[in-house]
Amino acid sequence: MQIARRWFRLASPLLLTLLLTGAGGGGTALGQDLAALEEVAAETAALRELPPVAALDPVFLTREEAEVAIEALLREEWDEDGIAAAIRSAATLGLVPAEINLLQLNIDLLGESAGGYYDPETGNLVVIQDGSFGALEAYVLSHEVTHVLQAEHLGLDELIDGMDDLTDDEILARVALYEGDASLTSILYVASKPVLALQLGAQLAAGGDLETAVFDTAPPVISLGLVFPYLTGTTFVQSLYEDGGWAAVDAAYASPPTSTEQILHTDKYLAGEEPVDVALPEAAATLGAGWEEIDDNRMGEFQIAVLLADLDPGAGLNDLMGTIELPDAASAAAAGWDGDRYQLWTDGEDAEAFVWASVWESDAEAEEFFLAFRAYEEARHDAGFTSERPDDLTLELDGGVARLALAGDTVSYVRAPTADQANQILDELMSDHLEKAA
């Protein structure tokens, strides 16, 4: 679950800003050499083949001031009820602890990592002033200037405004487009300047140990979800760039990716392969009076892969290579994804019902996920499913029952307080599948 939806405001990639920690030095005082900043902005626009920014008026903050500003931005945008529901869904699947303080975790994560950010609502381009303007700061500025260019020429504001009614998977895909674009642009900017690249290497080498304490203790769905747009998004945008130059990247803003599957497999984006819309039965009648739906969303291929990977905090990131690395089995089991949808229902107190259906590209792909998810559930609950048939399983849990079923290209998973409730909802899911297959 990409449960902190406003990460788009913080535009420097986590990997880069982890490298920023302690890596300042050399150059003139940041904020005192506007000509140097304007040069970076002009060269970035030329490289990106877009008109230069209308006016460069960056805001310079110390790290302490930036941490205060970041916290204020997060608190302003925080949807307490929506986030609470998302946490409950994520906890149901074992992705986060039920008691997690997600707001504070995000404040700490971004305070630890941010090197700068662009706020599309105010137009502020913020550069964190850690001492001097050197190669690393030029890298960050190039990234942030790209966001200004996106806002002025490519409809970034409209792209972000259109996220309100999207699933988390769709949001993560869109963020991967514009953060991948900004990341690739800043990489190419440094690569175009051999002296700057050497200075950047020297700055990083002199930076000492990287501070990743918060990242290393965060649930992987949070930490890897934060870096996915920058790392995997860069690979996606690079593929577009290699296929059709910056014109192909620009065109993606008018037809943005709609799933993390398309980010992970650029060929599927280029082929126009869209996720399947998955319908769920109305569970209210089965659950009874007083129950209400509090979360309706989509996992998507990336988050399913993270789920199946079942990583310890801090795992999954190869910071030397700048890539997300999940176990092959988890990635393979998620790779046949074709669509999914889940809902979380509550009785207003502690009782919950979770309904999740996923559709796969073939019956074989569905079975691969079914077996992988079964193994994941049995491992985390330290209990085995029971069944009379290998494709229709039951797991007794404290405070409820889980049902897992495979039918053709569809996998259904239901958790409810009673066996009758779980069975009836699963029967409705299976009936819907049979109607679709008929």
Regions found by a protein language model. Name each.
Residues A11-G22:
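Bacterial N-terminal signal peptides
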Residues T28-I100:
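A metal-dependent hydrolase signature that marks the N-terminal structural subdomain at the beginning
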Residues V40, A151-Q203:
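Post-HExxH zinc-binding segment in Zn-dependent metallohydrolases
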Residues A42, A213-E349, A357:
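Pan-zinc metallopeptidase signature
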Residues E67-D81, N101-L125:
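Catalytic zinc-binding patch centered on the HExxH motif and its immediate surroundings
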Residues L125-S142, A173:
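Short pre-active-site segment immediately N-terminal to the catalytic Zn-binding motif
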Residues D338-A438:
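C-terminal soluble interaction/assembly domains
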